[in-house]
Amino acid sequence: MELSLDLKRQYTYADYLTWADDKMRELLNGFIRLMSPAPKLKHAVALRKIGTAMINFIDRNNGNCQVFYAPFDVRFPKNPDKTADDQIYTVVQPDICIVCDSSKLDERGCLGAPDMVVEILSLSSLRYDLNEKYTIYEEGGVKEYWVVSPKEKGINVFILQENGKYDDGTVYEGNTQVPVQTLKGLSISTEALFKD
């Protein structure tokens, strides 16, 4: 059954939980953002390669971090003391996220900032991932944010600084190794990642 939702109205996570259809949505400061139904092949391949490298690294090193793929709800409360469902206005589903603090995990996903987020660009998500989500992740305290562009065959990496702002970002292109700050000792090869 198709839900009729007012895209100009603000909603909370409590509202979000009542939407019983199969559409993928996110909430940004209470406003609905519809997500693309299915990724393109290059998006799916990049997701698989990055996620697999991270999981294998964590398993080999007996790490405490966990890797999650969309759809996996990450809730960002505006105030750490206001975590009730009807007080949360931002819920996103990153392509990949790493959570190293298990106290942030519950049956519905992650409450608070993951340690790392990876968003893989598509034509429909370009502006959204580079602007709105960048701001959400920065303000929410995500320490490492990767924006992966299969089309441009590059990765832009943002690291959260002590002042709570992301650095200017480092672009990795060509045949290079991209260090994963969250998982010290792991790097991802851009050549292997974007190989046709």
Question: Residues of each region from the PLM?
Answer:
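Gly/Pro/Ser/Thr-rich low-complexity, intrinsically disordered segments predominantly at protein N-termini
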Residues: 1-196
